[in-house]
Every structure is written in C-alpha cells, then in structure tokens.
C-alpha cells in the first residue's frame, strides 16, 4: 500500500495554492528545484503524473485525491494534537461558498466558532453549482452547494433554501415595465449575472416568460452586494435573495417585479468524513443557523 510522505504532499499543495513552483518554493522556504524533486518523488511513487504543468498548474485526478487526503489529515491532526499545541498556530480552514451565502447568513453562522476557536478562514467564492468541485479537487475541506448527493468519503446535510426574487427600483419599473413585466418589455430591460456561467436570471425568464438564453442585455458583476446596489440605483433588474433585501423591500426602495414568482435554491453542506472536532463545530454552527434563517419547506 502506497503511503505518501506528507512533506512531499505539502509541496504539491503549495504549487496548487501558490499557482506555481517559484511561489511554492518561497512559501516552503526551500529551492524551486527541491519543490520539483518532491513532486517527482510523489509521481514516481504513484507511477503517474500528479500535476498538469499548465499556467497555473492544476492537479490530475490522482493529485486531487491526494490533496483531499492532505486536507483530512491536517484537520484530524488538530484533534489528536490537542488544544495546547494547536492553539499557538491557527488552523487554516478552506471552504468553498457561494457569494449570496457569504453576503447573507454564512458569516453570522460562523461568528461564535471564529470567536472561540483558533481558525484562519480561507473562503473561496464560487457559484453554488460549482463549489462541490472544489471539494472534489481537494482545494477545500467543506463546501456550500446545491448538489444534494455526497461525494465519496464525504458527508452532506441540508442547510435550507434561499428564495430569489426578481426585483428592481420603482424608477426602473416605471421606465422598463410601464405596462407590467411582459415578454416584450424584458427584452429591453438590462439584467446582471455574477459571471458568464451564472444562468439564474436567464433560467427564470425562460421558465416564466419563455425567453431563450442570451436574449436580454446582461452585465457581468462578480459581487452579490453590487447586485443590490445596481438594483437600488435603477441600473438593472436582478435576481436577489429575499434574505438579502428585506429592508429594501419593506421600505419600498426595491420592489418585487413579479409577485408570486421566485427561484428557490436549496443549499447543502458538504465536508470530508470523518470530521475532526473543529469541523464538527463548524458543521453544528452552520446547520443551526441555516435551519434558523433559511427556508426549510
């Protein structure tokens, strides 16, 4: 049975994290040649490449499995070594989260854990349809995802749902929808997406107004908070979580343009098994807060 030296695994991890051999060497305080030798040693052990030498480098499927193993070992070490030793060096906790969860419920959910535990968060923001892939690749130890099925050697629990409303300012509605939200009017109304893979707005319009993808003008903005600002200032109509704009809806600063119509995204918490003590604390905090503020029906 092949048992990798975790020092060599850390070299592989550093190349991926630092996006190259030179910065990985600086991070590990060794030469670039030493980094290459350690990775070559791993590849010889497993008889196959562990890195695709692109810019930046990316792990092969076997490399992903080894990185996932390293993440589990790092967390389990925290539990076995005890508080006295781990308290001096905060544990790095890498999580993949969607921007809307980060902008609404995730940080309050983790506030007590962060206050009571020696943790350094590394939050990697990704669309909720793709966060699970980061867990699969071993880049993170936990992920908030819309995927209900657990990966091999992982655990999953339902958190609850975010309900997305189609909203805009009153001025925007008066300008683009003077006769209500119609198929013809939507073709001229500017929209916004998080990135080129974000299809929520398009899916909502296709489902409810039979508009094909790509038929409406759409800005690309990688910020959940910017969606709210764009809607408030009358620049676009947006799909925004109800949880994020409760005050704006109550004050009338934003209005629900299609009352009774919404998009629901059920969220799930994925992490490696077995869980370390620290990860159990994180899991308990996320589930408790998620069940409190997210839709459960």
From Swiss-Prot:
Q: Where is the HTH lysR-type domain?
A: 4-60
| An annotated Gene Ontology molecular function | DNA-binding transcription factor activity
Recorded hits in SUPFAM superfamilies, A to Z, give: Periplasmic binding protein-like II (SSF53850), Winged helix' DNA-binding domain (SSF46785)
Looking up InterPro entries in the UniProt record yields: ArgP (IPR017685), ArgP_gammaproteobact (IPR023490), LTTR (IPR050176), LysR_subst-bd (IPR005119), Tscrpt_reg_HTH_LysR (IPR000847), WH-like_DNA-bd_sf (IPR036388), WH_DNA-bd_sf (IPR036390)
Q: Which residues bind DNA?
A: 21-40
Q: Which PROSITE patterns match?
A: HTH_LYSR (PS50931)
The protein's UniProt keywords, in alphabetical order, are:
DNA-binding, Transcription, Transcription regulation
Protein family membership:
Belongs to the LysR transcriptional regulatory family.
Describe its function: Controls the transcription of genes involved in arginine and lysine metabolism.
Q: How does it assemble?
A: Homodimer.
Q: Which NCBIfam families match?
A: argP, PRK03635.1, PRK13348.1
Q: Which PANTHER family match?
A: HTH-TYPE TRANSCRIPTIONAL REGULATOR ARGP, TRANSCRIPTIONAL REGULATOR
- UniProt cross-references to HAMAP family, sorted A to Z: HTH_type_ArgP
Protein known as = HTH-type transcriptional regulator ArgP
Tell me what organism the protein belongs to: Enterobacter sp. (strain 638)
